[in-house]
Amino acid sequence: MNSRHPSAPYRGRFAPSPTGPLHLGSLYTAVVGFCEARRRGGAWLVRIDDADRQRCRQTHADSILRTLETHGLWWDEAVLFQSLRDEIYRVALERLAAGSRVFPCTCPRRELAGSGPIYSGRCRARYPHPPAGEHALRLRVGDAVIGFDDRLQGRIEQDLGSAVGDFVVRRRDGLPAYHLATVIDDAEQRVTEVLRGVDLLDSTPRQILLQECLGLPRPDYCHIPVLTDRGGIKLSKQAGARPVDEDAPSENLWTVLALLGFVPEPPLIGAKPAEILDWAVAHWDIRRLPPGRRIDVGGLAV
C-alpha cells in the first residue's frame, strides 16, 4: 500500500523499550523527533515498546516518561503500552494464518544460531497442522523484494529471501515479535513518518512486507545517524551507556543540539528546557544533521 497522502497532518512517534533508564542516545532520538514534529506543526507521540515481558520493567517505563517530562519533551496523546495489546496482536496473527502467510517453526535457538542470519526454511513445509508444543510463527517471505525511499538515507531495496528469509512474527513464548507489534501500533497511532536510528534501517523492509500482508498503510521513513563512542560502538544500554542526569536537563539538551551542529545563542545559555526547545524548533532543519550514519560523541562521559 502506498504512503499516506502528503496532505495528512504530520504524526511522529518515539517508542523506547523500557529495559533501562533513558541514555544520551535515546534522548537524542527523542529530541530530533520532537523538533521535527513541532517544526512541521504536527503531533509527537510516545509509545512504550514493552511487549517483551522478560526484558522490560514498569519501573524503567516510569523513569523514561519522567525523564522526557524533565527535559520538556511533552507528548500530545495518551502513551500507548504494547503490553496491554496482546489481543490486538493475536487477531493480526489469525489474519495472517487465515491467508496462509505464516507457518509454525520449532527450530531450537542453538540450531538457528549455528545456521547463520538467513533462515534455512527447515520448518516451512514441516507441519501441516500446528504442533502441540511451543513454537514460533514465521512469515513466508517468498520472492519479495521491498524498496522504499528514506528521507535521509535515500533509496533502499532489499531481497528479503536472500537477506533474512522467513522471519519470526510470534515468538515461541507466544509474545508478538517486534516487527509485528511495531507495524500494528504505527497504523493504529496513524503515524505518518517513522523517525528512528539508522541501526533499524534493515528492519524496515520486513515491516513494509507485514504492512502489505495486513493491508496497513505505509508511513514515510527517516533513519537518522546514531550516536557512537570513540570506538564506533552505538550508545546503548547493552554497551553500558549511562542514564542521563535528570538534574541537568538544560545541559543535556545543549549537548544533544551541539552534536547536531546547533550552537546556542548567548542569551539562551542557562535557559530552561522549554526555552531551549522553542529555540531549537524555530531553527530546526533536519537536513542540517551531520551526514553519514553515525555521530561520534568524542570524549563525552556517556
From Swiss-Prot:
Required cofactor names: Zn(2+)
Motif ('HIGH' region): 16-26
Residues engaged in binding ATP: 237
InterPro entries to which the protein is assigned, alphabetical: Glu-Q_tRNA(Asp)_Synthase (IPR022380), Glu/Gln-tRNA-synth (IPR000924), Glu/Gln-tRNA-synth_Ib_cat-dom (IPR020058), GluQ/Sye (IPR049940), Rossmann-like_a/b/a_fold (IPR014729)
Binding residues annotated for L-glutamate, in chain numbering: 13-17, 49, 178, 196
GO terms for MF: ATP binding; glutamate-tRNA ligase activity; zinc ion binding
GO biological process entries: glutamyl-tRNA aminoacylation; tRNA modification
Cited function: Catalyzes the tRNA-independent activation of glutamate in presence of ATP and the subsequent transfer of glutamate onto a tRNA(Asp). Glutamate is transferred on the 2-amino-5-(4,5-dihydroxy-2-cyclopenten-1-yl) moiety of the queuosine in the wobble position of the QUC anticodon.
Family: Belongs to the class-I aminoacyl-tRNA synthetase family. GluQ subfamily.
Name listed for the protein in its UniProt record: Glutamyl-Q tRNA(Asp) synthetase
Organism of derivation: Methylococcus capsulatus (strain ATCC 33009 / NCIMB 11132 / Bath)
Gene that produces this protein: gluQ
